[in-house]
From Swiss-Prot:
<dbReference type="InterPro" id="IPR016089">
    <property type="entry name" value="Chalcone_isomerase_bundle_sf"/>
</dbReference>
<dbReference type="Pfam" id="PF02431">
    <property type="entry name" value="Chalcone"/>
</dbReference>
<feature type="binding site">
    <location>
        <position position="52"/>
    </location>
    <ligand>
        <name>substrate</name>
    </ligand>
</feature>
<dbReference type="InterPro" id="IPR016088">
    <property type="entry name" value="Chalcone_isomerase_3-sand"/>
</dbReference>
<protein>
    <recommendedName>
        <fullName>Chalcone--flavanone isomerase</fullName>
        <ecNumber>5.5.1.6</ecNumber>
    </recommendedName>
</protein>
<comment type="similarity">
    <text>Belongs to the chalcone isomerase family.</text>
</comment>
<dbReference type="InterPro" id="IPR036298">
    <property type="entry name" value="Chalcone_isomerase_sf"/>
</dbReference>
<dbReference type="InterPro" id="IPR016087">
    <property type="entry name" value="Chalcone_isomerase"/>
</dbReference>
<dbReference type="GO" id="GO:0009813">
    <property type="term" value="P:flavonoid biosynthetic process"/>
</dbReference>
<feature type="binding site">
    <location>
        <position position="194"/>
    </location>
    <ligand>
        <name>substrate</name>
    </ligand>
</feature>
<feature type="site" description="Important for catalytic activity">
    <location>
        <position position="110"/>
    </location>
</feature>
<comment type="pathway">
    <text>Secondary metabolite biosynthesis; flavonoid biosynthesis.</text>
</comment>
<dbReference type="InterPro" id="IPR044164">
    <property type="entry name" value="CFI"/>
</dbReference>
<keyword id="KW-0284">Flavonoid biosynthesis</keyword>
<keyword id="KW-0413">Isomerase</keyword>
<comment type="function">
    <text>Catalyzes the intramolecular cyclization of bicyclic chalcones into tricyclic (S)-flavanones. Responsible for the isomerization of 4,2',4',6'-tetrahydroxychalcone (also termed chalcone) into naringenin.</text>
</comment>
<dbReference type="GO" id="GO:0045430">
    <property type="term" value="F:chalcone isomerase activity"/>
</dbReference>
Length: 230
């Protein structure tokens, strides 16, 4: 799918932050489309408090790749399918995740929570090795001195080859290059897994992804007409 054929999708607004329909992430020259977006929050004393807004962008080739198995499924079917989100996380296409602060957060707070989720997942599936332990140490180091005000963002560009490009933005703009590139496929996938996986921290982002991708994966009317004529 060439850039001129990028899928037509709408922006998503969460609180005051707008995720545009397409972006060019740090560390890649390709435009990505907005797969879905949602908040991450917690119920505190009976009130739902939103901490971050999360947008998940996908390379255009995600659509034909996912269509093989998921074309024609309803939003509900996709929302309830662990395998669907696993196929997004591990699929042979690039992904870009933007985590934008609604409330202020320190890099240490963020990295500790993410790595805790990653390690728990790896231990559960039996894939936690020395390489992952070293990657976790480096990940925590990258975030150690960072602070994120409301509107600040953490940016992850995930390559199917195994690299994870991490960048930061304090003003909503996207830098052209990353702050650091980490070469660990498990960590690269685990960051997105921790958001939209089986125990993902943003059910709202999962629901948005499922609804929007269900529409994008529907057969084109022309294809249906052709099939009916055969």
């Amino acid at each position: 799918m060439s850039p001129s054929q990028s899928p037509s999708v709408a922006q998503v607004q969460i609180e005051s932050h707008v995720f545009p329909p397409t972006v060019k992430p740090p560390g890649t020259s390709k435009p990505f489309f907005l797969g879905g977006a949602g908040e991450r929050g917690l119920e505190i004393q009976g009130k739902f408090i939103k901490f971050t807004a999360i947008g998940v962008y996908l390379e255009d080739s995600a659509i034909p790749s996912l269509a093989v198995k998921w074309k024609g499924k309803t939003a509900e079917e996709l929302t309830d399918s662990v395998d669907f989100f696993r196929d997004i996380v591990s699929g042979p296409f690039e992904k870009f995740t933007q985590v934008t602060m609604i409330l202020p957060l320190t890099g240490q707070q963020y990295s500790e929570k993410v790595t805790e989720n990653c390690v728990a997942y790896w231990k559960a599936v039996g894939t936690y090795t020395d390489a992952e332990a070293k990657a976790i140490e480096k990940f925590i180091e990258v975030f150690k001195d960072e602070t994120f005000p409301p509107g600040g963002s953490i940016l992850f560009t995930q390559s199917p080859l195994g690299s994870l490009t991490i960048a930061f933005s304090k003003d909503g703009s996207l830098p052209e290059t990353g702050t650091v590139v980490m070469e660990n496929k498990q960590l690269s996938e685990a960051v997105l897994e921790s958001i939209i996986g089986k125990h993902g921290v943003s059910p709202a982002a999962k629901k948005s992804l499922a609804a929007r991708m269900s529409e994008l994966l529907k057969e084109k009317p022309e294809a249906q007409t052709a099939a009916a004529a055969e």
